[in-house]
Amino acid sequence: MPDDHKPLAGRTMIMSGGSRGIGLEIAERAAEDGANITLIAKTDQPHPTLEGTIHTAGERIEAAGGAVLKFVGDVRDDDAVARAVEQTVERFGGIDMVVNNASAIDRSSTDALSMKMYDLMQDINCRGSFLLSKLCVPALRESARNRRNPHILTLSPPLNLDPRWAGGQLGYTIAKYGMSLTTLGLAEELRADGIGVNSLWPRTTIATAAIRNRPGGAQRFARSRTPRICADAAYLVLTSPGQDTTGNFFIDDDVLAEHGITDLDSYRVTPGDGPLNADMFL
């Protein structure tokens, strides 16, 4: 029986990406309960501008209390993702949670966006989320039969049809909304199985390398919240009853508020009550 105080103890999560940033924080939060974590990530060696590798992430997960399977692979590679799923089931006995975290971003206008980058965003964001979710469905159904509360959680925004989001960055919007449509469709398709399928998106920009490395990034970084707010919100979603919590597009601070957490000062990069940057698509 699960520990009521550590509901993810012994549960198994498979995540795309996770070498750093929001994904790693989500994995660490689950590891604090004693969860098993598989990371599918490409960063095997240190990157010149991005901190962390799959190996340093694995060390942090183990230090937090979790068991980790580090799978160096690309979510664009069907065979590699299939092997990661198979090895996860072999190592940990099943899969209870899928977190679609891997994402590529280029906010260029249509005329400036190369088709190579367009394809990369489609392949990682939309197709990668569909592929990992699809390959995990049999294991998630087995988890549901065993009453282990399975979930799919995708880091993608609400389907906001305000034209300014498509008009400003069409290629990226298509890729991220493809992830969100995957949530919408799988939630309905898997509803009868009792598998929770949801998306999570931050209210504000999150202090990650992707923010810091952009032009003007230092100021935006200072006006952001830390990745821990997404991790705490993800934890609350993943520990909720999947059969009753599905088809939602959650915003991180809304999730916390629903659980009585309204003092968010600890999540600020810069203490105080100064302005925060709103995230995209809201």
Regions found by a protein language model. Name each.
Residues 1-92, 105-106:
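Short-chain dehydrogenase/reductase
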Residues 30, 94-96, 180-184, 190-202, ...:
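Conserved Rossmann-fold SDR core element
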Residues 108, 163-164, 195, 203-215:
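Short beta-loop-alpha junction of Rossmann-like oxidoreductase domains
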Residues 133-134, 184:
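A short, exposed helix-loop element centered on a Lys and neighboring polar residues
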Residues 199-200, 218-282:
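C-terminal helical subdomain
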